[in-house]
Design a protein with these regions (language model features):
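N-terminal, polar/charged subdomain of small-to-medium soluble alpha/beta proteins
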Residues: 1-95, 104-114, 118-148
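Short hydrophobic/aromatic beta-strand micro-patches
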Residues: 100-102
Length: 148
C-alpha cells in the first residue's frame, strides 16, 4: 500500500486521518482549500446496503490515480492536491474517499477538487462490492454510470 503522506494519490486498507492530510496541503501561500469526503451510505438504487468492499488492481490504480492528480496540478491554478481511497471491507458511515486541494484562490480549489473526484471515479480501477440487507450482493464497476 502507498503511504498517503508521500504521494498525491494513495490507497489505504485502514482508516486514515484527514486532519493530517489537510495539514500537509496548507502553507502561507494558500488562500483557499477545498475537500470532498465520500462516505459509505446505507442505501443505493432503492436497496438497503449493510456494508461494502472495495477492491483494486493496486499498481494500476495507484499509477492512474497519480496521473489524475498530475493532470489536476497542470490544468488548474492550484498549489497541491491529494486523494486517498479506501480498499477492503467498510461499514456504513466509514470514510471511503477523500480529496483535498489547496490554491491561492477558492475557485481553482473547488474546480480541481470536483475534477479529481470525477476522474478518479471514472478512470481508476477500483471496484465496489455492495452487500445488501436482503442477503444479496453485487459488484458496481467504475465504467458503469452511478447516480451522484
Amino acid at each position: 500500500m502507498s503511504d498517503p503522506q508521500k504521494k498525491h494519490f494513495a490507497l489505504a486498507d485502514t482508516p486514515f486521518d484527514t486532519g493530517t492530510l489537510r495539514a500537509g496541503l496548507l502553507d502561507d501561500r494558500v488562500g483557499g482549500y477545498a475537500s470532498f469526503e465520500g462516505w459509505v451510505r446505507d442505501h443505493n438504487e432503492g436497496r438497503t446496503v449493510r456494508g461494502l468492499r472495495y477492491e483494486a488492481y493496486v499498481a494500476l490504480a495507484e499509477a492512474e490515480g497519480e496521473r489524475v492528480l498530475g493532470e489536476a496540478l497542470a490544468k488548474f491554478d492550484i498549489l497541491d492536491a491529494h486523494c486517498v481511497h479506501r480498499i477492503g471491507d467498510l461499514a456504513i458511515g466509514e470514510l471511503a474517499v477523500w480529496v483535498g486541494v489547496s490554491a491561492a484562490h477558492r475557485d481553482a480549489a473547488f474546480a480541481a477538487c470536483r475534477f479529481i473526484i470525477d476522474e478518479v471515479k471514472q478512470r481508476v480501477p477500483i471496484w465496489k462490492h455492495e452487500q445488501y440487507a436482503d442477503g444479496d450482493a453485487g459488484w458496481l464497476h467504475p465504467d458503469r454510470p452511478q447516480n451522484s
